[in-house]
From Swiss-Prot:
Residues forming coiled coils: none
Gene coding for it: gpmI1
GO biological process: glucose catabolic process; glycolytic process
Pfam families xref list: iPGM_N, Metalloenzyme
PANTHER family, sorted: 2,3-BISPHOSPHOGLYCERATE-INDEPENDENT PHOSPHOGLYCERATE MUTASE (PTHR31637:SF0)
Family (UniProt): Belongs to the BPG-independent phosphoglycerate mutase family.
EC number: 5.4.2.12
Catalytic activity: (2R)-2-phosphoglycerate = (2R)-3-phosphoglycerate
Active site: S67
GO cellular component, one term: cytoplasm
Pathway membership: Carbohydrate degradation; glycolysis; pyruvate from D-glyceraldehyde 3-phosphate: step 3/5
The protein, known as: 2,3-bisphosphoglycerate-independent phosphoglycerate mutase 1
Species this protein is from: Methanosarcina barkeri (strain Fusaro / DSM 804)
Length: 517
């Protein structure tokens, strides 16, 4: 006799990256877009607001949320105190200045009479790095008597306004002059130095500037480098690598054998490629004309496979959502396009690379284009087609999906493109909801942080390319088992999903279910 396996009715967590809530209509791509599907879901089903920024997600008060932080909190089911908060606290306590990873880099530079290079995103954004950390490193180098200290400044323009760098670089230059002898040696937009999508031609441009002093442009000082980039029509993110020269027209500094590097970005995803280029012996992604042997320190753990000193190693999170589902023997799927794949896997699993038993992963490639305003739908339709097939397969108990569009297109600052991105996601959510209803599944639809709801700076009327600190909506879609949801935080999502699955939440999860009893 043939026994048929009963098809599962999946519980979905659909994360609409960058889908924030803001009442004002000006510069609000979410309100400007036609969103019949999301509008219908909000009218017909229970929903609430979730805090997705500041202390609610383990960041300093008022600090905007981001995708890494959002997914960590969602998966952990508790407030996860972020690296930004941990590092700020260590500076206040004084532990920062005794950190063995930093002191190792400094000892190496002093022992070899070599240079200490401080490399990373010069920004107040607080997403990848923070200006106070750079200041603390400069003070530490001065305190320890390092003679040759050079800064390789990557410019932001995404998590802060597109032309914030000139003021920030002027301020950093002044700080260097007042606190020792550090000098800015190179400038590069994050588009080049911090690529994460294996566009190695971009990484190579930054690497060559750092190791050979070879770059598209050279200027006598950092402020001129930024000013001239603005004249060329480049905003901070896209400033081409520029080498700062000394009085003889030679590069102020290049990274050489026996030098020390401290990469002060604390977020891993955009620090990996450049790190690999420096430290991987078998690196084949582009030819390295110079490969200096350096003492390399990472601010946080960029890659589990690299044996490098880490200033702030990860704190282990136990009993995160994926682990709890796995222990219950449930089949789970994580699906996203390239831009957010790490978020639904690595970050949702508490910052761990490992895949849990019963966890499948599906990566849909993001389109290979210069900027996503050129294709606001990105790969959302392909993600949708794939996930619909997976829903109909009846294989999965839980599916976690991320749509990247509202965030990635929001970062371009181009309003019309962001509107199209919102509409593409709305269309995809509608298709998924239809299929879920057919198979008897349910969904929680929410976001990890805001972005597309504010595409314009209301004061300056310039494009707003950063995340926001606005709340996000959370919708329950499915049967009438849930009568209402109460307002909460991102860390309340995992306990809510576990309640829907009738699984007791582990004691490590301090978040509360959003379901109104």
């Amino acid at each position: 006799m043939l026994h048929m396996t009963q098809a599962k009715k999946p519980l979905m967590l659909i994360i609409l990256d960058g889908w924030g809530y803001r009442e004002a209509r000006e510069g609000n791509a979410i309100l400007a877009a036609r969103t019949p599907n999301l509008d219908h879901l909000i009218e017909e089903y229970p929903w609430c607001f979730l805090e997705a920024s500041g202390e609610a997600v383990g960041l300093p008060e008022g600090q905007m949320g981001n995708s890494e932080v959002g997914h960590l909190n969602i998966g952990a089911g508790r407030i996860v105190y972020q690296d930004l908060t941990r590092i700020n606290f260590s500076i206040r306590k004084g532990d920062f200045f005794k950190n063995p990873a930093f002191l190792g880099a400094i000892s190496n530079a002093k022992a070899n009479d070599s240079s200490l290079h401080l490399m990373g995103l010069v920004s107040y954004g607080g997403v990848h790095s923070y200006m106070a950390h750079i200041h603390a490193l400069i003070k530490l180098a001065q305190q320890e008597g390092v003679k040759k200290v050079y800064i390789h400044a990557f410019l932001d323009g995404r998590d802060v306004p597109p032309k914030a760098a000139l003021k920030d670089i002027e301020e950093l230059d002044a700080f260097c002059k007042e606190n020792g002898n550090a000098k800015i040696a190179t400038i590069s937009g994050r588009y080049y130095a911090m690529d994460r999508d294996k566009r190695w031609d971009r990484t190579k441009l930054a690497y060559d500037a750092l190791t050979m002093g070879v770059a598209p442009y050279k200027t006598p000082d950092a402020e001129t480098a930024v000013s001239e980039a603005y004249k060329r029509g480049e905003t901070d993110e896209f400033v081409k690598p520029t080498v700062i020269t000394d009085s003889e027209g030679k590069p102020e500094a290049v990274i050489k054998d026996n030098d020390s590097i401290i990469f002060f970005n604390f977020r891993p995803d955009r620090a990996r490629q450049l790190t690999w280029a420096f430290v991987n012996k078998d690196f084949e992604n582009f030819p390295r004309e110079k490969h200096p042997k350096v003492y390399y320190v990472c601010m946080a753990q960029y890659d589990e496979t690299l044996d490098l000193p880490i200033a702030f190693p990860p704190e282990e999170l136990e009993n995160v959502l994926g682990e709890v589902l796995s222990k219950q023997g449930l089949a789970q799927l994580r699906i996203a396009e390239t831009e957010k794949y790490a978020h639904v896997t690595f970050f949702l699993n508490g910052g761990q690379e490992k895949c849990y038993e019963g966890e499948d992963r599906c990566l849909i490639p993001s389109p290979k284009i210069a900027t996503y305003d050129l294709k606001p739908e990105m790969s959302a339709y392909e993600v949708t087609e794939e996930v619909i097939g997976r829903i109909r397969s009846g294989k999965y108990d839980v599916i976690v999906l991320n749509f990247a569009n509202m965030d990635m297109v929001g970062h371009t600052g181009i309003f019309e493109a962001a509107v199209k991105a919102v509409e593409a996601v709305d269309s995809c959510v509608g298709k998924i909801a239809t299929v879920l209803k057919e198979v008897g599944g349910v969904a929680i639809i929410t976001a990890d942080h805001g972005n597309a709801e504010q595409m314009e700076n209301p004061t300056t009327e310039e494009p707003h390319t950063a995340h926001t600190s606005n709340p996000v909506k959370c919708i329950y879609f499915g049967n009438d088992e849930v009568k209402g949801l109460k307002n909460g935080k991102l860390c309340d999502l995992a306990p809510t999903l576990l309640e829907l699955l009738k699984i007791r939440k582990p004691e490590e999860m301090t978040g509360e279910s959003l379901i109104i009893k």
